[in-house]
Swiss-Prot record:
Pfam families membership: GRAM, VASt
PANTHER family reported for this sequence: GRAM DOMAIN CONTAINING 1B, ISOFORM E (PTHR23319:SF4)
Protein's name according to its UniProt entry: Membrane-anchored lipid-binding protein LAM6
Coiled coil (UniProt feature): none
Domain GRAM: 164-230
Keyword terms, alphabetized: Endoplasmic reticulum, Membrane, Phosphoprotein, Transmembrane, Transmembrane helix
UniProt subcellular location: Endoplasmic reticulum membrane
Keyword Endoplasmic reticulum applies: yes
Highest rank taxon of the organism: Eukaryota
UniProt topological domain (Lumenal) ranges: 652-693
GO BP terms in the entry: intracellular sterol transport
Molecular functions (GO terms): sterol binding; sterol transfer activity
VASt domain span: 403-576
Length: 693
């Protein structure tokens, strides 16, 4: 019975809608009002359709007529004043359907009117024709309501100093962005990152510095779609945008934080909606476009009628299946107005405006910073190579396997290419000149560029200098001829430089040459440099002083390498600084691979090394030095205890010798001892009077 009634009602509404459409298009507002007041359904058929049967099949007749005492019909009384006695209009029929579908039809003694929801308190249950009329006029009071709600939301901004620090921390922000407050929390990705969340009037930002890595997160408020309290964590808040979902936890007072974020977020969204309505109105006036009645029927939404039933009744949505396709026009007209006036279902105009507004303020971006070592502005060098790489590799050449003596293998806080430019600079070889002067060298010729090419296609350069010799016999100085060959130069992988030094003025000087190899590569983090130095003596003829020459060369190379390390540290400290570079992509942690194969760089998801942090190699060296220092102190203490123990044993030994001597000569001591005759008892008498003492 209920299904038949709904189908009949749908047919009646379809006829009513088809009849009102041409009248509205021709007569405008006045024609629509006259038609609504003059047109009515047949009362008998309407009553038949609107009566909801009870459990026993009886049909209650109360509650169907409009009267001032019935609050559920108060919204339509003003429209139906002239037609109460003549029959119920289509407007009354629509409203009565809403009430009938919201009533369960139970006859348990509870009045059916008490169960009906109030139409006046629910904007989504407003009557169809009232909605159509409101669409013609584009009610301005709805915009005023939005504006008033925005004005009523009061927030207190942070101080100017805090706002200045906030803008320095998050620079790509709109000029009108102001900080409201910030909270300590954890940002969850693969693992929680400790930091602070910053709430402004336009953005929700997060900054973290954990494990020497840094991340910054900026979420425009107008891109946030949902805010929720995480049920599994009593201190967590979930923020969801169109593309991502972010979880923050560790709030001391989550409810207060959630309430403030929600208020600011609501204010931003309401302001955007109000701006959209004002812009649309100005554009319409500027172009001379008026909201004609025909536009209501041509620009309706495409929402299904079952959504309308689900929002106006507590009954299951399956009742919508009994409605005809033409009934959707009623829902479309209602939804078109609700969507346009800023209900939770966003209209296309508001979506496009929101997207354009978000593009002007920047999208939700997460960017990372990594530590890099750069040249200071006062550095006399120029370097245009990479400061960080994603993949590193070991040296493809092994000096140990080629009978070369390794002098050094150490890490420096500088990119390999930058260290190479510093040590073998072509335009300003200040480092090499300083190093040669520390080795008692003079008369240094011009150190040019690697423009010469040998038969193997390798670039090299040559220069000469005079070196003082400190040998007890032989010449006091010698001329040194140096050829520096660039064997391999790839700033993203490794660099190999071979320095050949000949000393023709020394004994057997034409029979040998000293060859020093300098190899540069990236460290495992892809930020610093591993410098490896080795040497060997290359003989082209035999010599009877070969062992002595090799020994002197080795000692001289070891001493020169120590001076070289000190000079490198001075130059790095003077001309290199720790800086930050924006990381576009991040790679996973490196894996230990075989010799010569590429490996991933240690680049965690959030990156920023603090300036005061030490490189790993320096930390290890300092730790080893402290261990050696503790070891030396332990040895000293043990040595002192051993000396004291030895002294005590010597003293004890002397005492034992004395006791032994006494035991050996005890008879002689007794024989030479003087005997004393001590009487056992001495009698004393009291002197009498007259005795002379």
């Amino acid at each position: 019975m209920w299904g038949d009634s709904m189908r009949e009602l749908g047919d009646a509404m379809d006829n009513e809608l088809n009849a009102v459409k041409p009248v509205v298009e021709e007569g405008g507002m006045d024609g629509a009002r006259k038609f609504i007041k003059g047109k009515s359904f047949q009362k008998s058929s309407t009553e038949h359709m609107l009566i909801s049967p009870g459990r026993d099949g009886s049909v209650p007749l109360n509650g169907l007529k409009s009267s001032p005492a019935d609050p559920h019909l108060s919204d339509v009384n003003s429209i139906l004043d002239n037609h109460r006695g003549g029959g119920e209009t289509a407007l009354t029929s629509v409203n009565n359907i809403i009430m009938a579908t919201s009533t369960n039809g139970d006859s348990d003694g509870v009045d059916g009117d008490a169960k009906r929801p109030s139409i006046s308190n629910c904007s989504s249950r407003s009557s169809f024709f009232d909605t159509v009329l409101s669409t013609f006029s584009l009610k301005s009071n709805s915009q005023d309501t939005v504006t008033n709600e925005v004005k009523n939301i009061e927030v207190q901004f942070a101080s100017e100093e805090a706002n200045k620090k906030f803008r320095q921390m998050f620079k790509p922000l709109a000029p009108n962005t102001r900080l409201i407050t910030d909270y300590f929390c954890y940002f969850h990705r693969e693992f929680p990152y400790q930091g602070r969340i910053y709430l402004s009037n336009t953005h929700l930002c997060f900054n973290s510095t954990v494990l020497n890595w840094m991340a910054k997160l900026q979420i425009p408020l107008n891109e946030i779609k949902y805010l929720d309290k995480v049920t599994t964590n009593s201190s967590a808040i979930s923020v969801e945008t169109v593309t991502n979902r972010y979880t923050f936890s560790g709030f001391i007072a989550r409810d207060e934080v959630f309430q403030l974020i929600t208020r600011v977020w609501s204010k931003e969204n309401l302001t955007n909606i109000n701006d959209v309505l004002e812009v649309d109105e100005r554009v319409s006036k500027k172009k001379g476009i008026s909201s004609t009645p025909s536009s209501i029927f041509n620009n309706v939404s495409t929402n299904a009628y079952n959504d309308f039933i689900s929002t106006t009744t507590t009954e299951p949505t399956s009742r919508a299946s009994y409605m005809s396709e033409n009934d959707m026009l009623i829902e479309e007209a209602i939804r078109s107005v609700d969507d346009y006036m800023g209900t939770p279902r966003a209209s296309p105009s508001s979506s496009s405006s929101s997207s354009s507004s978000s593009s002007s303020l920047g999208s939700s971006t997460t960017y990372y910073c990594r530590p890099v070592y750069r040249l200071k502005p006062n550095a006399p060098f120029q370097y245009e190579g990479p400061f960080h790489v994603q993949e590193t590799m070991d040296f493809p050449y092994k000096p140990e396997a080629n009978n070369e003596y390794v002098l050094l293998e150490r890490q420096f806080s500088v990119p390999p290419g930058l260290l190479f430019i510093m040590m073998f600079n072509e335009d300003n070889p200040v480092f090499e000149l300083s190093f040669l002067k520390t080795q008692d060298s003079s008369n240094i010729s011009h150190i040019g560029t690697f423009e010469k090419v040998n038969k193997d296609g390798q670039h090299y350069r040559e220069f000469q200098y005079t070196k003082q010799l400190h040998f007890p016999v032989g010449p006091k100085s010698t001329n040194c001829e140096v050829a520096e060959i660039l064997l391999h130069c790839d700033w993203e992988r490794y660099i190999n430089v071979l320095s050949i030094t000949r000393t023709p003025n020394v004994p057997s000087g034409t029979s040998f040459s000293t060859r020093t190899r300098y190899m540069f590569r990236w460290d495992d983090q892809g930020q610093g440099c591993i410098l490896k130095i080795s040497f060997w003596v290359d003989w082209n003829a035999s010599s009877w002083i070969k062992p002595m020459v090799e020994s002197n060369c080795k000692n001289g190379q070891i001493s020169a390498t120590k001076d070289l390390v000190k000079l490198v540290e001075e130059f790095v400290e003077k001309y290199v600084e720790l800086s930050k570079e924006k990381a576009d992509t991040l790679k996973p942690l490196p894996s230990v691979t075989s010799f010569g194969s590429p490996r991933k760089v240690a680049a965690p998801e959030l990156t920023m090394v603090q300036p005061e942090s030490k490189p790993e190699a320096e930390a290890e060296i300092s730790e080893i030095g402290s261990d050696r220092w503790r070891f030396n102190w332990v040895n000293i203490i043990i040595l002192v205890l051993l000396v004291l123990n030895l002294l005590y044993l010597m003293k004890l030994n002397k005492k034992m010798d004395k006791l032994t001597n006494l035991m050996t000569h005890k008879d002689e001591v007794v024989a030479h001892a003087t005997l004393l005759d001590i009487p056992a008892k001495v009698q004393w008498s009291r002197p009498r009077r007259g005795d002379v003492l």
